[in-house]
């Protein structure tokens, strides 16, 4: 299942990159969040952790560091940061700011979408390396 999650996550990331290129920054953020969330859940599942049923799984990554290879521990802070940053923007990237009456398309910039895509891309790269080590060398 973990490998299937990663395949789906990479596909979603491609959609996020396309949305960014089209200037649909809110969509790039939403899709990047979905990609990163699914990637982190794949990483957790790959080491036998049943992930929490929530969007930000950064705490679960932190709580299970000992289950990961040493190299991945050096990059978990960026994974956790991305998970938190994207999760905080998940709702507004979809629905906008209902109190202010602003649609999602008016809330985010190209810098925001670039940051979102970078977080998701980094997570996919980390997961691919981990999976290559775990599943293809066994």
PLM region descriptions:
Residues 1-138:
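Terminal alpha-helical segments
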């Amino acid at each position: 299942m973990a490998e299937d999650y990663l395949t789906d996550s990479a596909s979603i990331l491609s959609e996020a990159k396309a949305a960014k290129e089209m200037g649909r920054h809110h969509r790039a953020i939403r899709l990047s969040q979905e990609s990163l969330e699914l990637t982190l859940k794949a990483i957790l599942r790959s080491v036998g952790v049943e992930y929490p049923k929530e969007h930000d799984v950064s705490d679960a990554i932190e709580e299970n560091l000992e289950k990961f290879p040493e190299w991945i521990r050096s990059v978990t802070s960026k994974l956790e940061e991305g998970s938190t940053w994207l999760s905080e923007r998940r709702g507004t990237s979809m629905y906008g700011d209902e109190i202010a009456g602003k649609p999602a398309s008016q809330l985010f910039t190209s810098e925001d979408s670039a940051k979102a895509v970078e977080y998701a891309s980094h997570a996919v790269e980390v997961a691919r390396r981990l999976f290559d080590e775990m599943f293809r060398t066994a």
